[in-house]
């Protein structure tokens, strides 16, 4: 590569790194289903909604005294299954398999002990930014 190719390569590398750092805007359910007092700060004072979403975080400035830019709820296989653990309503029995849970048209996540692993989905109609 000649001297003219080096600046082009530098630009491509910088753009590539920016794409790796920039987050993806979380789904509405991952943001709106998190109660304000459970928000974990993801930004800095004065952050804009655009900057916050670029970090892959949620933004909601409608509640005073809590972080406006905050980490979203964990991703799930279906938007209907995104909810706080405290919102889970049991749809199964202890030791239920993912397959048995799915046959009941319910959500399954066994990442947290002592909460329902098989739980009823929620409508996505209430999800918003």
From Swiss-Prot:
Tell me one GO biological process term: positive regulation of cell population proliferation
The subcellular localization recorded is:
Secreted
Keyword terms of this UniProt record: Disulfide bond, Repeat, Secreted, Signal
The superkingdom listed in its UniProt entry is Eukaryota
Q: Which InterPro entries match?
A: P_trefoil_chordata, P_trefoil_CS, P_trefoil_dom, P_trefoil_dom_sf
Q: Where is the signal peptide?
A: 1-23
- Which CDD domains does this UniProt record tie to the protein? Trefoil
Pfam families according to UniProt: Trefoil
Q: Name one GO cellular component term.
A: extracellular space
Tissues expressing this chain = Stomach and pancreas.
Reply yes or no: does the keyword Membrane apply: no
One molecular function GO term is: CXCR4 chemokine receptor binding
Report the PROSITE patterns cross-referenced here.
P_TREFOIL_1, P_TREFOIL_2
P-type domain span: 29-73, 79-122
The primary location reported for this protein is secreted
Which cysteine pairs make disulfide bonds? 29-127, 31-58, 42-57, 52-69, 81-107, 91-106, 101-118
Recorded hits in Gene3D superfamilies, A to Z, give:
Spasmolytic Protein, domain 1
Task: Sum up the protein's function in the record's words.
Answer: Inhibits gastrointestinal motility and gastric acid secretion. Could function as a structural component of gastric mucus, possibly by stabilizing glycoproteins in the mucus gel through interactions with carbohydrate side chains.
Protein name, UniProt field: Trefoil factor 2
Q: State the organism named in the record.
A: Mus musculus
């Amino acid at each position: 590569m000649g001297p003219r190719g080096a600046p082009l390569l530098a630009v491509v590398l910088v753009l590539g790194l920016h794409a790796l750092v920039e987050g993806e805007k979380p789904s509405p359910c991952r943001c709106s289903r998190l109660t304000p007092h459970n928000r974990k700060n993801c930004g800095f004072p004065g952050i804009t909604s655009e900057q916050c979403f670029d970090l892959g975080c949620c933004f909601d400035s409608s509640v005073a005294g809590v972080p406006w830019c905050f980490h979203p709820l964990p991703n799930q296989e279906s938007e209907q299954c995104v909810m706080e653990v405290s919102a889970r309503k049991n749809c199964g029995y202890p030791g239920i398999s993912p397959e048995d849970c799915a046959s009941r048209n319910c959500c399954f996540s066994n990442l947290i002990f002592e909460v329902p692993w098989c739980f009823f989905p929620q409508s996505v109609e209430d999800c918003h930014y």
